[in-house]
A protein has these predicted regions:
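Polyanion-binding surfaces on beta-sheet-dominated domains and ring/shell assemblies
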Residues: 1-160
Length: 160
């Protein structure tokens, strides 16, 4: 089974693209959760053989603990993205259009909840930037992403 999550962002700043990545993670997790609950996404050892399918096999019901364990095998870590920027030497988080269009340097950071980077995309549009400034951008992005992971967990808590 394959799931495609498609977010068409036709005209947007970095913050909108990052928000769509973060929202797509929630959509994917909810879709997987629903497939597991409906018996359409089962652990490998519980999947029917072709012969069982032909003979009227019924999907087993997983306990809530089994569902959560399987969900975490399917999607081991949540994903989020956030934008950061450097404007006249100051570091900003989650740039809106005005900040994004005035940024000397802007960066999109995509990361997993276990702390692994998926993407660091930064551009010195109006200026170059130092290693120290890069570290400050990443540190602020990391703090913002930690907050997004907390929000994602709160949203997903209790939703089946």
């Amino acid at each position: 089974m394959a799931l495609n999550v498609d977010c068409d962002i036709l005209n947007a700043d970095g913050g909108t693209r990052c928000a769509s990545i973060t929202a797509a993670n929630l959509a994917l997790r909810l879709a997987v959760r629903r497939l597991i609950a409906n018996g359409q996404c089962l652990p490998l050892e519980m999947r029917p053989t072709d012969e069982e399918k032909k003979s009227g096999w019924k999907a087993p019901t997983l306990t809530p603990e089994q569902q959560m364990e399987h969900e975490n095998r399917v999607i081991p870590h949540d994903l989020a993205a956030i934008s950061v920027g450097l404007i006249e030497g100051d570091v900003y988080l989650d740039l809106d259009y005005v900040l994004d269009s005035n940024a000397d340097v802007d960066m999109n950071v995509v990361k997993t909840a276990d702390g692994k980077y998926v993407e660091l995309q930064g551009t010195g549009e109006e200026s170059t930037f130092s290693g120290e400034e890069l570290s400050a951008l990443i540190a602020l992005a990391d703090a913002g992403l930690d907050g997004l992971f907390e929000v994602q967990a709160a949203i997903l808590d209790g939703i089946n």
